[in-house]
Each structure stands twice: as structure tokens, then as C-alpha cells.
Amino acid sequence: MLPRMLKMKTVGTVLAVIWLFGLAFIYVQSTSSSLRPPGRHPPPLPQLDPLIPQNPPQNDEIRPKKSAPPIPTINLAEDTTIHERTEKDVTWKTFDVEKFLNKGKWHQGEDKYKANSFNQEASDALNPTRKIPDSREPQCRDVDYSKVGMQPTTVIITYHNEARSSLLRTVFSVFNQSPEELLLEIVLVDDNSQDVEIGKELAQIQRITVLRNNQREGLIRSRVKGAQVARAPVLTFLDSHIECNQKWLEPLLARIAENPKAVVAPIIDVINVDNFNYVGASADLRGGFDWTLVFRWEFMNEQLRKERHAHPTAPIRSPTMAGGLFAISKEWFNELGTYDLDMEVWGGENLEMSFRVWQCGGSLEIMPCSRVGHVFRKKHPYTFPGGSGNVFQKNTRRAAEVWMDEYKAIYLKNVPSARFVNFGDITDRLAIRDRLQCKSFKWYLENVYPQLEIPRKTPGKSFQMKIGNLCLDSMARKESEAPGLFGCHGTGGNQEWVFDQLTKTFKNAISQLCLDFSSNTENKTVTMVKCENLRPDTMVVEKNGWLTQGGKCLTVNQGSGGDWLIYGAHCELNNGAQRWIFEKLDTYE
């Protein structure tokens, strides 16, 4: 029995030793990366292209690379027709122009502006290869692009019920003004135009591919379709009523060759909507926006103008782009998430892409030596499914939700009806922002657009005061007049009230007048007065639903004539006429 016990003890000892050696081995392996012998160094980091904006780790913390969400794409087989080329030897120079134009000419007695919101008679009278004035600055004519390793481009043009004459002039100007080796192809996307034959006829021209949407898709999804079939490494998006000027393409492609994360646009000259005269635009303009998220052109300030005039051929940093005409590396376009496919038709996508490019490590630039003329129409000749106002609010609301952080409250204050827009699911767009480790909107305002005036922060908390289904409303009344009650609409405005804890005042956000019901007279009607004339003793007691002033509570009762009376009365815990619901509104705080 004893030998057997000794034998078992020996085996146990051996197993224990093996176990201890195993633990030691695991520990050494796990710590070896941080215990390198002297003289041994980690492999060098790859060199970063100094021209490409980088996202350095913050606070010495290396963030892991996020997995990429799928590139937003559209199933072309389901809802798109690609027109066949049945004639093999047609070039843009041998295309039967007269036959093509005669099928859509304006006729005497017809409204010249109805179909296109520009003078079609004037457009039809022009030669499709007319000469336009060289609007470039003199220094641009001396720039040599021959030593820059430029990649070719696919030009993508979407159109919907475009006049044949303006569309053909657009296509011919691209061919005529672009070096053949840099223009791989033109992709036309017909967004379900009434005249299907336009696309079929243009598809016969070599180096043109024509897609037709089987239903109306809008510019955004049409452009993504065009990008999906594009074969060139650079995408150039153009509108369907433009004319390219001399050497318009080289500055765009050269800049992308230097900086693949630059999104570049030409200076957009003006083609007069009435007579089609070509007018050169100022090079001192750049893109901006206001807090309703409407794009606007703005003149550079004096400092920026001095810098531009000192380097007249250099790229112009622009906070936003108009969106109709720009070039981008296809790889960068896909990495950025193409377009937001849940936006509708047109509008707001240019600001969304502008924010995305800047905040995610790219740059947005206007190339002063690239000029393209554009017909700026005063109104849209086509309808927007769902209405143009609703479409624009949905699109801009999506942009604000994804990119503007706390500053979206400024947008919502300026466009209060946007609060009620169903903007859909933005999960995929937020995932793109997270994956690319994009910067904040605060960074964008400070580093890209410091010239934009930011509204002063609201001092205090903003409320909508509800009692039942009615809200306290200033009714746009003046000083010494009484506010009223009105159906709650949730859009702020006359129903937005601001409680300032510091000054102990309760004022209307629009009129800036304060509520006054502190009179010693019981049941005295509340009035609105200048805040500086009011004793600071207003308090919000949310748990009771009270708004108090001078020991009285704001009270509501309905008079004999059905009118609502609002006054100060002795506070009573069980008085429902004094129990307000303070609904906090989004504000920039």
C-alpha cells in the first residue's frame, strides 16, 4: 500500500512542476512584446503622404480600425435599363446632329420657358460646338500639367426631361474640351424622362453609356448608379445644362493626382437663362451656407482674397460645394459612403457631402483654372415626388442628425417644421462616421469655416408650456399685452419660452418679452413686459408643474365667453389649472 502511495505522490509532483512551467511560458509569451532586448526596435511605420490629411490618434491612444460597412449600392438589374449600341462606327463628330435636334425643337407659338425654365428658342439656335470666351485668369494659361501623372475620368451626367439642344451641347463640350487620353467615357443616366428616345440615340455614340431609370429616382440615386458602372479611377459629376471651357479637366485631375482625398470643383461661370450668353464668374467666390442649411455663394474676406491673388492658380479651400459639378477619386467616393441613398431626389446632398469630406479627412477645393458654364434656372421645371419643401427638409434633417452634433439645434430653431420630418434610419450613415473616425462639427466650424457666424447660445432652458392640448403662446403680441393659449405645434417660435435661472425671468424666445403676473392684485391678467422692468423672482417648479412669481402661480381658466384667462393666483397643490407640463425644446446650449 505504501509504495503505491509514494508512486502517486511522485506523479502528482511531476504534474505540478509541468503546470508551473506552462504558466511561466504563457506569461513570458504575453509580455515579450513589451520586453524587447536593448537595441531591438519595432519595424518602421509606413511613410504617410504629406498631401493627404491624416487623422492622428488623440490623447496618445491608438484606436482600432473599424470594419467597413458595405458601400451603398443599387441593384441595377431590378430597375435600370442599359441602352444597346446598335451602330458601331458613330463618334461624336459623325453623329447626325440635325436629325437628333429636330425631334425636340421648340416651335413657334409655344412657351419658350415652360418645358425647361430657360429660353429653349435661344438654346436651340446655338451650335452644339459653339465657341465660348476663355474666362480663365491669364496665369492659368501658363500652367503645365504634362508632368503630372493624371488618371482618366468617367464623366457622369444625369438628366430628367432635359432639352435635346442643351443636353447635346453639354455632351459635345465634354468631348471637345477634354484630352482624349483623360476622358475614358461619358455615362448618361436618364432619370425616367418622358422622351426615352433621347437616351437610345445618344447611346450610339462611342464612349457613351446610357442608363435609364425605369422609375423616377432623383439625382442622388442616379449618380450612384452612374458611379457603379463607371470604369475610370476618377469620377466627374456634371449637370445636364453646362458647357466646359478650355482645359477645364486637367486642373481637376492634376489636383486629385496630388491629393487623392481632395474633392475638386471648377469655378462655375454663368450661362444666361434668357439669351444663353456666357459670362465669367468671379474667382473670389466660395461655397458657404446659412443655418437653414441652404447653400450660398459668398465672397471671400479681405485676408482670403489677398492670399488667393498672391497665388491665383492655387486651389481655393471651400467650406461647401454647390454639388452639381465636381470630381472625386472613385476609391475615395466609395470609402466615404458614396451618397446617402435615403435622401430623396435633390437638395441638401451637397452640404451633407461637404461636411462628410471635411470631417472625415478630405478637403473640398475650387480649382481656379478650371471653368465650366452652367445655366442657373430660377425655378425647377420638374416636380419633386412628395413636394420640394418636404424633400429638402428630410434631406437636410438627415445631414444635421449625422454630422452637426449639438449644432443641429441651431438648424432646428431656424427651420422648426423640420422637427416633425420623418428622416428615416441613419444607422448606416453614423456607422460611416464612426468607421472613418471623423471629426466633430465643432472642429469643422473652427478649422474650415470660422467665418460663419454662430448664434449666441441661449441663456437658460427652453420650454414649451402645455396644459392639456394647449400651449402658452405669445400670439405675436406686443409689450403690455397678454399672451394666449393655442394648439401645441412643437415648432417653438411664439410657443418657445426661456427660463433664465441667473436672472430668474421667463421670456418668449421670439419677442424677448417676459411674463409679469407678480401684481398684488389677485387674479390680475398676466402681461408681457421688458425683462429689465421686472423684479427677478420667477421660478419653475417642475415637480408641481408650477410657474411662480411674487408668491403666485400662473393659472388658467375659461371665461364665460369661452376665452381663456391667464393670470396669477394663490398656489394650490391640487389645482389642475396651475399644473403645467414643461416640455424641453432642443436648443443650442
Swiss-Prot record:
It is found in: Golgi apparatus membrane. It is a single-pass type II membrane protein. One of its GO terms (biological process) is protein O-linked glycosylation. The keyword Transmembrane helix applies. Its main location: Golgi. Mn(2+) binds at D239, H241, H374. One of its GO terms (molecular function) is metal ion binding. Residues 1-11 are cytoplasmic. It comes from the Eukaryota. Residues 150-255 are annotated as: Catalytic subdomain A. Substrate binds at D191, R216, S240, W346, R377, H380, Y382. Keywords: Disulfide bond, Glycoprotein, Glycosyltransferase, Golgi apparatus, Lectin, Manganese, Membrane, Metal-binding, Signal-anchor, Transferase, Transmembrane, Transmembrane helix. Disulfide bonds join C140-C369, C360-C438, C471-C488, C514-C531, C553-C571. One of its GO terms (cellular component) is Golgi membrane. Its cofactor is Mn(2+). It is an enzyme of class 2 (transferase). Gene3D superfamilies: 2.80.10.50, Spore Coat Polysaccharide Biosynthesis Protein SpsA, Chain A. Residues 32-589 are lumenal. Its EC number is 2.4.1.41. Belongs to the glycosyltransferase 2 family. GalNAc-T subfamily. There are two conserved domains in the glycosyltransferase region: the N-terminal domain (domain A, also called GT1 motif), which is probably involved in manganese coordination and substrate binding and the C-terminal domain (domain B, also called Gal/GalNAc-T motif), which is probably involved in catalytic reaction and UDP-Gal binding. The ricin B-type lectin domain binds to GalNAc and contributes to the glycopeptide specificity. Catalyzes the initial reaction in O-linked oligosaccharide biosynthesis, the transfer of an N-acetyl-D-galactosamine residue to a serine or threonine residue on the protein receptor. This is Polypeptide N-acetylgalactosaminyltransferase 4. It comes from Caenorhabditis elegans.
